[in-house]
């Protein structure tokens, strides 16, 4: 029986995948275009042809990664029939699921936030519509008494920082030679949910 031919991803996709992995685990400044080219199986000139320079590559990586993160968070926010804490929990679970399947992606989000300046502004611009939705949701839930009344944007910032930090901690441990087990990830998520529930409800 003939075997199926391996799927060959488009060059641009391969370069973006490699860049997400390297920027998200090693850091942007510590990664060269030569390393990205080697990891994606192309020449450096090919990377430059598609993205112009390293900053252009970072911009494309941010756009794609932010869109992927937004889709994952949207799934949690848009689940029907959920209100109050149940919807917050759904968003946290969606984030941890993304971290399990695409750990370098959340590492990249953290790296872009660390870089600040134009890269962080670009990430914020892509996520801003989702931030508005989440803030409006918190306003409604606080008015209904299902979530403790606080400044919704500060709550969102604290929750975002806590969840992204906890989710990317998995990749940090893996890089240090302590690969997480499914049980340890579930335990970390459970602890985080308990912490957030005490802070919000």
Model-assigned labels for residue ranges:
Residues 11-19, 36, 61-69, 73, ...:
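Generic hydrophobic, amphipathic alpha-helix propensity
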Residues 54, 61, 65, 69, ...:
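Hydrophobic/aromatic residues within well-ordered alpha-helical segments
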Residues 14, 18, 22-56, 60:
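Helix-turn-helix
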